[in-house]
């Protein structure tokens, strides 16, 4: 079912006729309803909460995606087991409903004056660089035409062990903690990252005004 949903999103993205796009989206709704019978809502939160975790959250910014948890030190190994499973492969369960949550956040941002000012500022500072031309939330057309295949491709390319780091603080035995991390993450293979394109911005030599 997930593969079928993924294919439907690709079909929806490629279709130019608005009526046909609506028909495809109705099919996505239908198949997603069927797929939801095999998914557990908030599965990760439930698993983490069972360890006594608190403060579970995440944020994304220009150069980082950060996942946060407060874990009791006696549950560290169980937490690592869960994270190893999560970072070993991605399954986009309940993608349809999660997309709606992102839409809501995107819509709220359109009425947030501080965000709108920041968008204009970054656009003026970086007319060529993605930091100025691509907001963290993306553009409306991105959300209207999502691609599960593109998300999987991004995960496979960037969610690799040589591109992320653990930051652990608290009442920890350093040597034992490193041993546990090696146990669960040490076997994940190194993967070359996609090449970076160097973007050179021209110096700002005059006042830039936006209204």
Where are these regions (language model features)?
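Acidic helix-start/capping segments at beta-turn-to-alpha-helix junctions
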Residues: 100-105, 202
């Amino acid at each position: 079912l997930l593969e079928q949903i993924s294919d439907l999103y690709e079909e929806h993205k490629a279709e130019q006729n608005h009526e046909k796009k609506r028909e495809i989206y109705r099919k996505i709704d239908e198949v997603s309803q069927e797929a939801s019978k095999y998914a557990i809502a908030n599965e990760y939160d439930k698993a983490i909460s069972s360890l006594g975790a608190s403060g579970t959250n995440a944020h994304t910014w220009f150069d980082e995606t950060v996942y946060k948890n407060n874990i009791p030190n006696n549950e560290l190994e169980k937490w690592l087991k869960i994270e190893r499973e999560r970072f070993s492969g991605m399954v986009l369960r309940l993608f349809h409903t999660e997309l709606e949550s992102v839409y809501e956040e995107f819509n709220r941002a359109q009425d947030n004056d501080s965000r709108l000012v920041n968008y204009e500022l970054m656009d003026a500072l970086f007319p060529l660089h993605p930091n100025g031309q691509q907001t963290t939330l993306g553009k409306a057309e991105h959300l209207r035409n999502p691609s599960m295949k593109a998300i999987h491709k991004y995960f496979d390319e960037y969610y690799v062990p040589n591109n992320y780091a653990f930051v652990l603080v608290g009442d920890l035995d350093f040597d034992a903690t490193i041993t546990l991390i090696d146990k669960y993450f040490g076997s994940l293979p190194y993967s070359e990252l996609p090449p970076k394109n160097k973007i050179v911005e021209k110096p700002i030599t005059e006042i830039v005004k936006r209204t």
